[in-house]
Amino acid sequence: MGKVESFELDHTKVKAPYVRLITVEEGKKGDKISNFDLRLVQPNENAIPTGGLHTIEHLLAGLLRDRIDGYIDCSPFGCRTGFHLLVWGTPSTTDVAKALKEALEEIRDKIQWEDVPGTTIKSCGNYRDHSLFSAKQWSRDILEKGISDDPFERNVVE
């Protein structure tokens, strides 16, 4: 079985919330895809409940797409502590952290239920498992701690 980078990471050494560049893959024609770890809560200390995480996922799909050129996908970790973000190109962790901060601020301050995409039986595979209340609470808590552009040293972005 191939090695998976995130399983090699010492989860006891990181200091969430943070943005971490996992890898940059280069295609045969030189195109690059960056994979980021958007860690919202401290591993093995907490986990975002599925309803809140699911709603944050649906909202980040649009909010990060609006803020990051080359956005491909943002998918939750099974451990429910954050997300993988895939983008074309090589944006800095600082730029990604600032975009994430802005997106979470919008969730916390502006988003209403009617703004959440993909919440019907036709548009979501588990449409009953959403919680905007939880998404707003978690966004508030994450923002209060600040989002670092370094996983090991707290370097909170403005």
From Swiss-Prot:
What is the enzyme's class at the highest EC level?
lyase
Intrachain S-S bonds? none
Q: Can you state the subunit structure given in the record?
A: Homodimer.
Give the cofactor note.
Binds 1 Fe cation per subunit.
The biological process GO terms on file are: quorum sensing
One MF term in GO for this entry?
A: iron ion binding
Q: Can you state which reaction this protein catalyses?
A: S-(5-deoxy-D-ribos-5-yl)-L-homocysteine = (S)-4,5-dihydroxypentane-2,3-dione + L-homocysteine
Record-listed E.C. numbers: 4.4.1.21
Q: Which residues bind Fe cation?
A: H54, H58, C124
Q: Which family does it belong to?
A: Belongs to the LuxS family.
Q: Which cofactor does it need?
A: Fe cation
Gene that encodes the chain: luxS
Q: Would you tell me the protein name for this molecule?
A: S-ribosylhomocysteine lyase
Would I find Cytoplasm among this entry's keywords?
A: no
**Any idea which UniProt keywords this protein has?**
Autoinducer synthesis, Iron, Lyase, Metal-binding, Quorum sensing
The record, for Gene3D superfamilies, names: S-ribosylhomocysteinase (LuxS)
Q: What does this protein do?
A: Involved in the synthesis of autoinducer 2 (AI-2) which is secreted by bacteria and is used to communicate both the cell density and the metabolic potential of the environment. The regulation of gene expression in response to changes in cell density is called quorum sensing. Catalyzes the transformation of S-ribosylhomocysteine (RHC) to homocysteine (HC) and 4,5-dihydroxy-2,3-pentadione (DPD).
Give the residue range of the signal peptide.
none
* InterPro entries for the chain: LuxS_sf, Metalloenz_LuxS/M16, S-ribosylhomocysteinase
